């Protein structure tokens, strides 16, 4: 392979880069995300027909990497714009690190000045009728074994606190602090920032008591005591949705449902921003866009 030596050089820098991420207390989720992007880029370099190095790497090579990612997608679908933007961000940060540790005058970060516009979409939450099905399932689930207790706790945290999947992955029983009618939950959020979640104590008191009495450290844990990773949480949620007869996937749909329910109850947008852990209120504003049914209803109401 013509680029093998370059690929090995990138790998060497990546080992140092990962050490820096760990030393600066970046979350496991962040490190995994970088690992996925950079390893994919290294594999692309190994297969790339053009001979490249730090000295002659160009913007067109990065665009070809994005095209390569399109081709290797298991799903027959276009690579999401948000994914492209994330890959560029990861590579720019990594190559900036290389620049700081490489004896060269070349500004590698300039290669990644690629403007990728991510279309604004109104997030879809769980339909009201399906929320009722999910809540009925949670109300009737028998808390008589570990798997049922874990299922109840994970679903309630995602549905009623607005937690992200990555936040759930690192959440520990000791992070739950009782304060009046609430549990205040301290965790690490997106961008490795400290984040506070809230959930009514009455919703999960039995589950938390079980975890404490059985010395279970992590909320998302397997029966054998191992911490669940993102793919295991994803499969657990999808299996649960299928079991109760609703067609959704993953954890983020429940976060969207939480956000939309707050907006529907006229909770102040600044408060919603804090509850979701958004860095910018502009991100939160996407939940204020009315859906098509709301627009139609409002229009018909004006004709009455």
Outline where the language-model segments fall:
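Alpha-helix N-cap/helix-start motif at helix boundaries, enriched for small hydrophobics
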Residues: 91, 154-155, 162, 166-171, ...
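Catalytic-site neighborhood detector that most strongly recognizes the C-terminal catalytic loop/helix
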Residues: 125, 188-191, 276, 282-301
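Short basic/aromatic active-site micro-motif
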Residues: 149, 247-266
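Active-site/catalytic core of tyrosine-dependent DNA strand-transfer enzymes
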Residues: 200-246
């Amino acid at each position: 392979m013509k680029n093998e030596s370059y690929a090995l050089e990138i790998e060497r820098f990546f080992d140092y880069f990962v050490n820096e991420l760990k030393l600066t207390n970046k979350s496991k989720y962040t490190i995994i995300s970088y690992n996925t992007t950079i390893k994919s880029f290294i594999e692309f370099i190994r297969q790339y027909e053009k001979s490249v190095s730090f000295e002659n790497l160009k913007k067109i090579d990065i665009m070809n990497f994005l095209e390569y990612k399109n081709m290797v997608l298991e799903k027959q679908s276009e690579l999401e714009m948000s994914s492209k933007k994330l890959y560029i961000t990861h590579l720019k940060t990594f190559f900036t690190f290389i620049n700081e540790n490489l004896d060269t005058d070349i500004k590698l970060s300039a290669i990644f000045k690629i403007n990728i516009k991510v279309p604004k979409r109104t997030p879809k939450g769980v339909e009201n009728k399906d929320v009722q099905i999910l809540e009925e399932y949670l109300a009737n689930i028998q808390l008589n074994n570990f798997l049922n207790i874990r299922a109840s706790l994970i679903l309630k945290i995602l549905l009623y606190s607005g937690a992200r999947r990555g936040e759930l992955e690192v959440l520990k029983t000791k992070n739950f602090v009782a304060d009046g009618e609430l549990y205040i939950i301290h965790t690490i959020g997106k961008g490795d920032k400290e984040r506070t979640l809230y959930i009514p104590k009455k919703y999960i008191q039995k589950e938390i008591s079980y975890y404490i009495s059985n010395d279970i450290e992590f909320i998302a844990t397997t029966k054998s005591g191992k911490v669940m990773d993102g793919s295991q949480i994803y499969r657990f949620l999808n299996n649960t949705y299928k079991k109760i007869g609703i067609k959704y996937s993953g954890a983020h749909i429940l976060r969207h449902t939480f956000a939309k329910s707050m907006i529907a109850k006229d909770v102040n947008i600044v408060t919603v921003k804090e509850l979701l852990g958004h860095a910018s209120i502009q991100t939160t504003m996407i939940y204020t866009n009315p859906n098509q049914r709301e627009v139609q209803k409002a229009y018909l109401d004006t004709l009455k």
